Every structure is written in structure tokens, then in C-alpha cells.
Amino acid sequence: MKKLELKISPIFKKGRKNKAVNYRPINLASVPAKIMEAIIKDEILIHLRNNDLIIGLQHGFLPGRSCTTNLVDYMNVVTKALDRGVSYDVVLVDFQKAFDKVPFDGMLAKAKAHGIDGELMNWLRNWTEHRRQRVVLNGVDSEWTDVMSSVVQGSVLGPILFLIYINDIDDALQADDEEIYVSKFADDTKVGREVNGASDAAKLQMCIDSLVRWCRDWGMSLHPDKCVVLHFGPKNLEFDYYIDNNKIKPEKAARDLGVYVSDTCDTSAHVNKITKKAHGVLSQIRRATVVRDRRTIMMMYKSFVRPLLETSAPAWNPYKRGDVDALEKVQKRALRMIGDDGSLCKMSYENRLKTLKIQSLECRRTRGDLLETFKYLNGYNDVDPYRLFSFVRDRHSRDTRSHANNHLVSEKTSLNLRKFFFTNRVTKDWNDLPPMVKEAPSVNSFKNLYDEHIGL
């Protein structure tokens, strides 16, 4: 049988550029091949979802799941625990070359266990086992090399096969302790637990040991030096945890799916990081542009700067005035860079926003909160809304999960970090929306109706 031949382009990640391990291999497949993969991927997804085969909180590469849904769920669990006055430890796990180490036989065995068989299984076996690849860099090709393992990175089908491969991690980690929290975005995995004493810490350590055993059984490995633990709670006893004999490094803050999460759940660490980066990009734009007309500056700001300030914002939207102002300062600076309209410089910030027909970042985050709420309540986010929100009961329905007009109820809280968390801070704004907006038939309709409601 002729082997499938793949060309691989190395994409730099971080670290030293002269080390091959710091590059990610991306498959340069043809368009027909990608179309074929997309068709098969869609059918596999339908099969997995119709049979409820995806275990636990996997948010990667799935419709209705995202970095935002992952982070919102994570911070919901942690802030709720802290509001109850308990400590919480979370280990952020780093798999070593996760996609590259998936063994063919293990992946195919798990695909079969998920009900994939027959001609599709034969196709998958040919697609995975019978291939060779070479690196293409600056027009130069390396020699062909047989591929002995790995899910094809940069492919359409590879990610869903990887999800199938690690799908049973939750069962392994929660087998002896249902209180263990497991959250995944592809291979980015978090395991956590309330830890109020040595016995709780021992249970979390047992979970970590189970993860190490799972990795050994299935040909994967962890990177102990890149795993970190966050000790949440002012009275946290900060127990030590180990991967084999390697102590997991405790951190005050850690970057998770693009968001810096601190052990106090304070948003300032994240705001400081992203505003510093955004100001740096603005400086590059200033140096690179000669003609700073309105169209050019606004296009570059919206493309390269504003996304840095809004990624997964529902999970970290700040309530401290200093953080809010620090974010707004970036947009104020961007608008001052417009040089083709001298009248803008003389206007107040509010009038500049009206003239340019844009919102303040604070208002945009409110809109983002409401949009995310709409997605949760209407099934666009594939997460049970009752996991996050509380509702006013519908007195005319016998259904205990029925709610009247999606009317939300805020929790009684003791800490500001919980009071201003997404599910509580959005309550009043959501309840104040007209029914016509809340009952919009689609996401785009909701956006348009909301913008009309606030006069945009």
C-alpha cells in the first residue's frame, strides 16, 4: 500500500529558535484532503454527541465550547468555593508533546471503543498508520521519514481524534473521589479540589498519581517542570504536590488559555499583562504608519489591539475602577493617534466615541457578558445553564427546571470576587432587557436588537 505523504511546516512557539523542540509541526494538506477530513470529522462529531460519548468538561474543538466557556466554568467553581470560605487547590497539567506522542494502536482502540468501526475504521487506520512526512522550510525539503505515532497537527480531523484519545481521563481521575474537578481544553488540563486539611490534599495527590499512571498506560507523559499549582484562599495551607518525585511548582499567578489567573482571583495581574502588550502594539503601529487617517488607525486598532483586551472577557471582566480605567486608557490612546481630523483631538473621549460610532471598552464588555448569557440560555453554548445560573421559577409550570422569561436571580455573596463574577454581575443587566431582545431568534439578531436597544 502506498503511504500517505505529508509535508510539514515548522511553526515557532517560544524559547530559543535554534532548538527543534520549540517548533510545532503543521500539516500542509491539499484542499481536497481537508474537505474529506472535514466531512469525516463532522460525522464523528454527530456520532459522539448523539450518543453522549464526550465525558466531563472538555471544551476544546467542540461546537458550543470555547476557551471562554472553559474559563467561566473554572472561575465559577473557584470563586464559589472561596465565597464559602474554603480553600481550593488547582494543578495546571502540561503534557509533553501531547499530539506527537499518541500511539496509533491506542488511538484506534479508543476510536473503536467509541463505536467507530467498519469502513470508517479502515480509512482511519490507513490515514494514521500508513504515512510518512518531510519538513518544508524556506523552499527546502528534508528527507522522507516514516511516522510512527502522533495525531496530525494542523489537520482538520486530528483534534477530534485526540479528544477521543484522552476522553477517559476524567474516569481515571475521579474514580476514587467525585469531588475532584477536571476541566480540559484539548490537552490543557486542570485538576482541582477543596483542600481544607491533609486528608483533602492526600486525595488530590492520589488524583495526580492516577494521572501519571494513565499517562504510562497510554503512552503519554507529563512535563513536571511546566506543571504548576495555584493555592486559592487566604487561609490556604499550601500543601505540596508531586509528579513522581518532582515537586509541582506553586505560583501566585498562571497563564491559562490566554488569561492570567492569580491565586486571589484578582484581575489586576491579567489587566496589567494585556494592557502592557496592547500599548506595545500601539507603539509599533505608530512607528509603522506614516499616514494616520481614521480608516487605517481604526482598522489596525480593531484588528491587532482590541482583541488583546477582550479575549474571554466574561471570565475576568474587572470591577475595580483602576483596572477598568487601565483598559480604557489603551483605547483613548488609539483614538488620539488619528491624525487626519484635527477636530477629534479637541473632543472629549465620549464625543470621540460618538463621532467614530464605537463604544467604550467597558460598555463592550457589558455587551459581551449579555451575549454570552444569551448563548448559555439558548443552547448556543453547549453547557447546562443550570450549572452556572439561578432562575426565577415559573409558577405555571410543573417542570422544576422551568423558568419565567429567563429571569435570573443573583446569589447572596460575602466576597466581591463572587459578587462581581460573571453569573452575578450580568443578572440585573439581563433582567432589564426587553423581552424582544432576550427572545431573539439568533445570535446575530440578539446583537442587532441589543444595539438598537442602547441606541447604536
PLM regions and their residue ranges:
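Basic, alpha-helical interaction scaffolds
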Residues: 246-314
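Conserved pre-catalytic core of RNA-dependent polymerases
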Residues: 1-152
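Short, conserved catalytic/metal-binding micro-motifs enriched in Asp/Glu and His
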Residues: 1, 24, 40, 94, ...
